[in-house]
Amino acid sequence: MSTYFSIITVCLNSEKTLARTIDSIRNQTFRDVEYIVIDGGSTDSTLSIINDNKDIVNIFHSGKDHGIYYAMNKGLSLATGKWIGIINSDDWYEPHTFQTIFDLSKNMNEGVIHGLCRYYKGEKEDKVMGIHHNNLREMAICHPTCFISNSLYQKYGNFNTNFTIAADYDLLLRFYLKGVDFLFLEKILANFTLGGFSSSEFVRIDALNVRRNHNLVSSKTYIAFYLYHSAYRLIHFFTFNKLKTIP
């Protein structure tokens, strides 16, 4: 019999933050969990941290890959749980999260459940917010708060690795446009560290490409947006480098 939850963490040289992520799995009040860690070939003490937590890490794979979404797809291929959550190696769950999702999902055949996220800048709390799924056509929701039925991946596919930063947005938008049931919970489920992989200016361009791929953006709007953000990046680049050269 499969476990109820499969949780996936992708990491690379995450020695400073991974233990906190693992502890957030260990401290859950609901324990029918399969924990999968996919490492991209770390050269720091990340592997030692994983080995020290084999009582929590059920499945572990380490080796070079082609990027974060390839690694996430590897984790999905190994997952046997009915519901799947993906938590980054610098993010962490609230202790009640799995129990909360179980209580809501046990009477659902399949769907996506998501909620509020607490955002941090460094060690300082920045804000708490959640984007309702009805806004998915315009903006992404916080992926670490999402729990998705395994069956939906089987029906509609995994992460599209053509997107380098916003493949999680593409995945959720794909499900939403297919008519999948979403449930938004006004409760903090996860904590997210700003400044990581998905916090750069480049995510806006990739998110625009996602919307264009789903025919949600006209060619005229796409070109205008792309030119604006390309100009913004160039101005920022030259301004920064000019400041660096001032004696």
Model regions and ranges:
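Conserved nucleotide-sugar donor-binding catalytic segment
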Residues: 129-206, 210
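Acidic helix N-cap motif at the loop->helix transition within catalytic regions
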Residues: 16-19, 44-52, 96
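N-proximal low-complexity "stem/linker" segments adjacent to membrane-targeting elements
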Residues: 1-26
